[in-house]
Amino acid sequence: MADLEKMIEEFTKLRDQISYHDVLYHQKSKPEIADAEYDKLKQKLVEMEGQLPGACVTQDGVGAAPDEKFSKIKHREPMLSLENAYDEQGVERFLSRIKRFLIEEEIEVFCEPKIDGLSFSAVYEDGRFVKAATRGDGFIGEDVTRNVATIKGFPRFLQDVQDRLEVRGEIYINNSDFLKLNKDNEFANPRNAAAGSLKQLDVSITANRPLKYFAYSLIGGKEKSQSEVLNRLESLGFCVNEHRSLTNNLSGMLEFYNKVYNCRYSLDYDIDGIVYKVNDLILQSRLGSTHKAPRSALAYKFSAVYAKTKLNKIFIQVGRTGVLTPVADLIPVNIGGVLVSRANLHNQDEIKRKDVREGDIVTIKRAGDVIPQIVRVDKGSRHADAPGFVFPEICPECGGKVQAEGAAIRCSEELTCKAQIIGKLSHFVSKGAFDIFGLGEKQIKFFYDLGLIKQIPDIFNLEERLNEFSLKEQPDWGERSIANLLNAIQNRRVITLDRFIFSLGIRFIGQVAAELLANYYVSYNNWYNSMIKLLSNDAEVGVGGVEKKIAKSFSDELVGIDGIGEKVAESLKSFFSKEHNIKMLKDLTDYLQILSVNSNSSNSVLNNKVIVFTGKLLTMSRGEAKVRAKALGAKVSSNLSAKIDYLVAGEKPGNKYKKAVELGVGILNEDQWYRMINSEVSE
């Protein structure tokens, strides 16, 4: 359990780190790390998701909130990111997964280079170019219509096009043009130059920059495949990439990768991998998407690089759950265009296993890690008297007792450790939670040290507290900045249930689990009262077997929710068992309006129905069946009880079928299920 908690702590840090770089990258065009390093951060997130229980993982965003300087445009269809793979096994898993999902033995795959540029969306109405937007956070982007219109060769009018057509692609700058543009070293690389050039309030600056683009997607057309989409885009006058291929097997996918990989330096633009897409658009639609990426596409990123440097010092970070994480401070070294100065050492056992010591010469690998990894220690260059690293016996932040939990070392002072309190407060206001603009970790520390924000409810009482404190006398604070912050807090007094649950920072509950809980319980009162009711059962029991039976009832209800596991159930029970958490919830509800879940499928006969699947389905995989059910507003459970509305029974349904008959649960065979969901679509 301790190892899992440690991983979730690291996962949370990574999410916050990515959010920080999202703002620098998407809003300010002033990244502190190169694109390749950012991709590696995202890759680590994917790797950790694979190691964590599904309900624990956090759904990270696909960009950053739109820059306040620009008007906003809401995307009709989200501009999602892509799942990444870094080896052939990852590509093979992708192909196997989509075949299994679709129950198809052979699937045609479209292959194309992944352009290292800035994503855009352009909308045409009756052939006339009317607006363009950046990706933004994937749902809302910046309005860059006038800027895109200045790009040489970008179509302003499309012949013989009616109704609405949306074109998506990537804006970039050629390497040769970048060298001419960047004589004063204003930009780190061509991608940053493209982003900075496009997002100019003065469009004359954009017009004078050598921006180019490739189009790769079309929404609103009648094409049936990705290859047809590219051909149509080309016929309409858009620039499309010449390097593309169709294949129906793994060897063909890898052959295209190797071909492009070997010629990539002869191209006059940067690419950072290959994109694979299911060619058939109907199959793409069936596959659907997760919160952050389409299931029908994969980016196979180029491989890792290595470098040697010196490890200066090992220091300890304390996270919001109290885990002590060792981090290596390195002499900065350039690895494939990325300046690396830190490496994650994970835990005490990792340091002992690798025998890492301060002053060592180490080999760093950069390949999708949260912070690049130390893969080798040059012990031959080590001083004979170099001491081994000694893990602290007390918390370096608060001086409290630490205790070993598996490989993790944890500070036990949850309520008094400053690092943990700051971590929880910072998580509460972070992206994905309350997302309060202008109130990040730096400001949280500032207000904490002043005694103005000591616990979460204090955030919403800050204005009243400032009546007795002259904040404008503090450095960097004036009337305008104070007003902006208070307005930002005021604007976050209404929040959806899933974001509220996530904001609480309950161990093992990321955005995925929070959304599952919100969809199941629908309203805050129902969720809160259900948790309290389940806990009250424990208070009424005696000891021994009876206690175990009642305790299991708490787990039974939660584990029955599709995607929720035992760890989440245990964590919720622990959270609601603590009086200070109950008080915090009551205080927060005095300040907040927590919105109930509003289904987009309110007219569906499956809306808010609870469904259990059993047996083998022939017309679709179990995974696709669950996706289709949830899309129509249903809740999917794995446990059968009298509360279940329908049992969908495939071949060889087993004991669940008999139990459903006994309980009087409605039973649908596969044909009835198939007709039900398809009648919903046709309507």
Curated annotation (Swiss-Prot):
Its cofactor is Mg(2+); Mn(2+). Its EC number is 6.5.1.2. Residues 601-683 form the BRCT domain. Signal peptide: none annotated. The keyword NAD applies. InterPro entries: BRCT_dom, BRCT_dom_sf, DNA_ligase, DNA_ligase_AS, DNA_ligase_CS, DNAligase_adenylation, DNAligase_N, NA-bd_OB-fold. It comes from the Bacteria. NAD(+) binds at D35, A36, E37, Y38, D39, S81, L82, E112, R135, E170, K277, K301. Coiled coil: none annotated. One of its GO terms (biological process) is DNA repair. Zn(2+) binds at C395, C398, C411, C417. It catalyses: NAD(+) + (deoxyribonucleotide)n-3'-hydroxyl + 5'-phospho-(deoxyribonucleotide)m = (deoxyribonucleotide)n+m + AMP + beta-nicotinamide D-nucleotide. Keywords: DNA damage, DNA repair, DNA replication, Ligase, Magnesium, Manganese, Metal-binding, NAD, Zinc. The active site is at K114. The keyword NAD applies. GO terms for molecular function: DNA ligase (NAD+) activity; metal ion binding. DNA ligase that catalyzes the formation of phosphodiester linkages between 5'-phosphoryl and 3'-hydroxyl groups in double-stranded DNA using NAD as a coenzyme and as the energy source for the reaction. It is essential for DNA replication and repair of damaged DNA. Belongs to the NAD-dependent DNA ligase family. LigA subfamily. This is DNA ligase. The lineage of its organism: Bacteria, Pseudomonadati, Pseudomonadota, Alphaproteobacteria, Rickettsiales. The gene is ligA.
